[in-house]
Amino acid sequence: MTHSPPHLPISPPPHLPTSPLRVWRCSHFGGHNFAPTLIDLPEGRYWGHLDPDILEALIHRNVPVSQLRSFYRGWAGLGQYEQILERELWMQFGWKWLSYLKAGQTLAIDPENEEWEADWAEVRIDYASPDGAVQGAYTARVEVSGTVLTQWSSKTPELAAVKQYRLCELAQV
């Protein structure tokens, strides 16, 4: 990523469609100072650790979604624990999942820790295809599976343990 004024429109590479794709750039945002990050608007999907091949796959949606699992960070319409379930449902439903209407809720959460540092949460996602022909709901338990040491800022070299989560007890309701 380059260090230019934010919100400066740039042209997409010549091999990518010119409409309705609109590419913007900025130096960085949020906590992702060390890897390119994308917010796909107006959908509100977050993607991380991108490279040109992955970006092209996202634009054309021409690879199996399983190849993109590690790049998908979640959808802005859901809470952090609901996003973990939503990613798994995307893996099951494929590209069509991104067009489904969704609503998420946290049913229960670890009372021993702060909400953003919970060791577990029970979540639910209700969904429907745009025409209503496919609809349903899933619940799951999200639990800590370990930690990863990460550097929060390029200004401070200290590493901090950050909880990593896994999906447990997935059930269609």
Model-assigned labels for residue ranges:
Residues M1-V173:
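Histidine/cysteine-enriched polar flanking segments
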